[in-house]
Amino acid sequence: MAASSSSLLLLHKPTYNFHFAASSVPTYINSARFRISSSIFPLDRRRRRRIWSVSGFKSMADLVKTNARRDGEDRFQALEQEAFISNSSSELQNELVSDAGDGIEAIANRLSKWIVAALFGSVLLLRHDGAALWAVIGSVSNSVLSVALKRILNQERPVATLRSDPGMPSSHAQSISFISVFSVFSVMEWLGTNVLSLFLSGFILALGSYFTWLRVSQKLHTTSQVVVGAIVGSVYSTLWYVTWNSLVLEAFTSTFSVQIALFLVAAASALGFAVYVLLNWFKDDR
């Protein structure tokens, strides 16, 4: 009987399960557990805090440095852009001004021969006498003298690529000086010495000097080439005018054959000059 009751007791499944909830655990056990864990691992928590604080400080410092570097680079790029824009605008303005100045001088240089030729033609038409015929011959012979001197001296131009022919003396300066001096002599002969004649003479000489200076500014001749051309043209014009008054005028007024000869030579010279203009001046203006 006792054996059977003990076997039933062993095989009997208990009706209640006893377990403690988290809230039912005594508080002193939890606090003790917390104290144990915190007392066991105090260094790890401090190290983690220090590591986090150091890494956080480093990351913040790196972030500040990166932002500062980016701000500095952005400001530097902005300054570079502003400097580039300002330099570009100033260079563009300088180029526009220089191009405008060079364009005006280039146009004036191309028109100079036409203006001087028109001035010379006007003087010849106003004179319409033997001195005008003599001046035509002198102008053409002055140009021939310039070509001969160029071949003899054979001095290169300042920029050989612009013109291949020699530059000493300047044929433009020599021709302009010849015509300017002859025009001044004609004005003084017509009007005498007064305020008007002096003003016109000064204007003619100033215009001729400006046109000769353009040959230097356009790098077609050196200063010495222009000065030599101006001196040769002025001296040749003076001698040509003096020769007319001292020698040719008397023979022209007294001898008909001299008049015919002078007229034919002047006509041939004018025709040759016209052919030269058609072959060279229009080609240079293109």
Curated annotation (Swiss-Prot):
GO molecular function: phosphatidate phosphatase activity
Any one GO cellular component localisation term in the record: chloroplast inner membrane
Result of knocking out the encoding gene: No visible phenotype under normal growth conditions.
Positions of transmembrane segments: 133-149, 173-193, 194-214, 226-246, 260-280
GO biological process assignments: diacylglycerol biosynthetic process
Tissues showing expression: Expressed in root tips, root branch points, cotyledons and leaves.
Cell compartment(s), UniProt: Plastid, Chloroplast inner membrane
Activity regulation annotation text: Inhibited by Mg(2+).
pH-activity relationship: Optimum pH is 7.0.
InterPro entries attached to this UniProt entry: Dolichyldiphosphatase_PAP2, P_Acid_Pase_2/haloperoxi_sf, P_Acid_Pase_2/haloperoxidase
PANTHER family (alphabetical): LIPID PHOSPHATE PHOSPHATASE EPSILON 2, CHLOROPLASTIC (PTHR11247:SF77), PALMITOYL-PROTEIN THIOESTERASE/DOLICHYLDIPHOSPHATASE 1 (PTHR11247)
Role noted for this protein: Exhibits phosphatidate phosphatase (PAP) activity in vitro. May play a secondary role as PAP in plastids.
Family: Belongs to the PA-phosphatase related phosphoesterase family.
Protein name: Lipid phosphate phosphatase epsilon 2, chloroplastic
